[in-house]
Regions:
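Hydrophobic secretory-pathway targeting helix
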Residues: 1-52, 73
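Arginine residue identity/basic-tract feature
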Residues: 2-5, 10, 30, 57, ...
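Alpha-helical transmembrane segments of integral membrane proteins
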Residues: 3-22, 365-677
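Soluble extramembrane regions of membrane proteins in the secretory/endomembrane system
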Residues: 33-357
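Non-cytosolic juxtamembrane linkers/loops
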Residues: 312-391, 397-410
Length: 677
């Protein structure tokens, strides 16, 4: 029986290693895709600059130069509306009675109509003509009428004045030309107009073709431009011009802001897409310039964001004008990106990467073997059926993969790998502890304890990083990079390993004087555990565990518990000094627990304490693997984050060692005093 068990485990280990190599190769290909897309586009509102010039008593050219010097590469151009055209001195809009008072010589003016005239400039005439063209597409012939009488040129429009003034008229060709003439790229932000004619779509592309500086399209509102009738034509038209569709990251940082038709349009464009980070003005005003810059910078390097849309502060800061205030925090983003190896310019578009199907199939086989190995660790009696379970799992997974091509299978296997990797790694550590449990501390000493702990930590960490290759390899394709699809079960990757390692632990170490080796033993263990007397100290301990659980589970995922200011400061410090900021639960909690758990083993501390320390070790290893579940984060960043966590955890071990030494001295001191009483 034991020989069969060893044979099964060796076979599974070989399959796991082969699968991990396939996952690592896919991850290497993924790294090259991500490394080739290192340019971030910095976008600011074109109209904000025009509006600020008059208020700040400067010229628009001076403001354009200010923003260019401070990192802005592109100008966002929105749909025009009559109100904006009036404010920019291109047209005049009158109610009927106002127009009649100004032009009594013109007959047939109706008080309930709206009248539009150009401003007497070359730009006014150009914009007036383009406005007439747009209105003819959005209104029927009976609703728009041209007037030319006694040298007066005007348009008569039927409508409600207040609503008409804010009515979107579409992207104007002249605005695109003017924005592009200042040396910036132009990012268009069209809103959908329900049931607009095909000519309106054609007019949009006429505006797109007005400048070779158009670098992207960000749809405005809850629908993509052209929805529903012409969304495919819009997608194809943009693709033919090599203009990417920009997808706005959701506020939760998971997926995108919902826009009807967006995912279909993304597929029609062959995934010629860019991820964008935008912050609301209400959020911006809560932050100082340094923190605002940090938010954009972290989004770019950690979440494959390749376009930033910068909002404006509501008020100027530090004795600067509002434009100087905005330019300063944008410059902070640019400087940090360039120091990190990025460049600013036209947004990089990732290649539409999909791994070779056979290679992914090998990674799947390894993930299945990892799950089966974990099952056998949890229920050793199943080892006699290990070959059968493995065969059924492999055949079932591969048949589903090759026949159905469903993402849910990949997501389930990735979840299984993320859960099982820390369980297997910590189980190996437990096996090591079993061999060492009879070793006295006098044979070890503090120096050897530290060295042994460091070696075990790095050994476990490397194994966890190897296991993480399954998560990365299984989910590596453009849909997951852009988060059109994503890893499912983040909370489970935190909770399930703790439950499973507890099952493994009670089979290896005695609780209540006996290990659990059968169903009856487990039932007896549960009964004894439930009959533990609740004392004040235990309640206090449970309260501490509850707080830790809240921080550990509640802070995971994308909608976690709030982060205190002192921790934000620590994070920003680590971001400044390290390539990738490690997770606190790894280097401050899980990794130092390796040393303390060994100290507990050698000094024969209570078994319950040793168990909780093993749980802490599992948290650290699980967190390393879970990092790779965020497929929007570049592979190299997740990998280096794991290494940085191990390095920082090694330093934290020094503090843990000192704390244990002090604790031992204190208990010895008070124990001796108590013994003399």
């Amino acid at each position: 029986m034991k020989g069969l068990q060893q044979t099964v485990f060796k076979l599974l280990a070989v399959l796991i290693l082969i699968g991990a190599m396939a996952g690592a190769w896919i991850s290497w290909q993924r790294y090259h895709v991500e490394a080739a897309a290192q340019t971030v586009e910095m976008v600011y509102d074109y109209n904000n600059i025009l509006d600020s010039a008059a208020i700040e008593r400067t010229t628009t050219d001076a403001l354009f130069e200010l923003y260019r010097k401070n990192g802005v590469t592109s100008l966002a151009v929105y749909d025009e509306n009559p109100e904006k055209l009036v404010n920019h001195n291109f047209i005049r809009v009158y109610r009927g009675y106002e127009f009649q008072a100004r032009h009594p010589e013109i007959s047939g003016i109706l008080p309930d109509k709206i009248y539009i005239q150009p401003v007497d400039t070359a730009d006014g005439s150009t914009y007036f003509k383009e406005m007439a063209d747009h209105l003819s597409l959005l209104y029927s012939r009976d609703e728009v009428k041209a007037i030319s009488e006694n040298g007066v040129e005007a348009l008569e429009v039927s409508g409600v004045y207040d609503k008409f003034m804010t009515m979107p008229l579409g992207i104007f060709t002249n605005t695109v030309k003017r924005a592009g003439s200042h040396g910036f790229y132009v990012v268009l932000r069209p809103a959908n107009v329900a049931h607009a004619p095909k000519a309106f779509i054609d007019d949009f592309f006429h505006a797109v073709d007005a400048s070779d500086k158009v670098s992207g399209v960000i749809f405005q509102g809850k629908e993509v431009f052209g929805y529903k009738e012409y969304q495919k034509e819009v997608s194809q038209g943009l693709n033919q011009r090599h203009i990417p569709i920009v997808m706005i990251e959701a506020q939760s940082q998971l997926g995108f802001e919902p826009q009807a038709g967006l995912l279909d349009m993304a597929r029609h464009s062959d995934y010629h897409l860019v991820r964008l980070y935008a912050m609301s003005k209400d959020e911006l005003i809560k932050l100082n310039q340094k923190e605002a810059a940090a938010r954009f910078y972290i989004s770019d390097i950690e979440r494959n964001i390749r376009m930033n849309l910068f909002p404006s502060y509501k008020f100027a800061l530090d004795g600067k004008t509002l434009s100087e205030t905005n330019a300063a925090y944008i410059a902070g983003v640019r400087d940090r990106l360039e120091n990190h190896g990025f460049s600013v310019g036209k947004a990089s578009v990732m290649d539409a990467y999909f791994p070779e199907k056979p290679l992914r199939a090998v990674a799947m086989a390894g993930a299945v073997s990892l799950i089966v190995l974990t099952l056998l660790l949890l229920i050793p009696h199943l080892s006699r059926y290990g070959m059968v379970i493995e065969a059924v799992g492999l055949i079932g997974a591969e048949v589903l993969y090759w026949l159905l091509h469903v993402n849910i299978l990949l997501q389930l296997l990735a979840l299984g790998a993320a859960v099982c990797t820390p369980v297997v790694v910590v189980s190996l550590f437990l096996q090591y502890c079993l061999k060492k449990k009879d070793t006295a501390f006098s044979e070890v000493g503090w120096g050897r304890l530290f060295g042994e702990s460091v070696m075990i930590l790095w050994g476990c960490g490397i194994l966890s990083l190897i296991g993480a290759c399954f998560v990365s390899g299984l989910l590596s394709d453009i849909r997951f990079f852009l988060e059109m699809e994503y890893f499912r079960g983040v909370k489970a990757t935190f909770v399930l390993p703790l439950v499973l390692i507890s099952v493994v632990y009670i089979q290896k170490f005695p609780f209540f004087g006996k290990t659990v080796t059968s169903d009856k033993d487990f039932v007896s263990f549960v009964k004894k555990f439930c009959s533990i007397q609740i004392r004040l100290g235990l309640l206090l301990g449970l309260g501490i565990l509850a707080i830790v659980g809240f921080v550990f589970i509640g802070r995971s995922g994308n909608n976690g518990a709030p982060v205190p200011q002192f921790e934000i400061a620590l994070r920003r410090f680590l971001e400044d000094v390290m390539y990738a900021r490690p997770r606190e639960k790894e280097f401050l909690f899980g990794h130092p627990a390796v040393l303390v758990s060994l100290a507990a083993l050698y000094r024969k501390w209570p078994q319950l304490l040793h168990y909780f320390l093993i749980v802490a070790v599992t948290i650290g290893q699980g967190s390393m693997v879970e990092t790779f579940a965020h497929m929007r984060s570049p592979f190299i960043l997740s990998f280096i984050r794991g290494l940085d966590g191990l390095a920082a955890g090694t330093l934290s071990m020094v503090g843990a060692l000192l704390a244990v030494m002090i604790l031992v001295r204190l208990t010895k001191f008070f124990g001796e005093r108590y013994g003399k009483v």
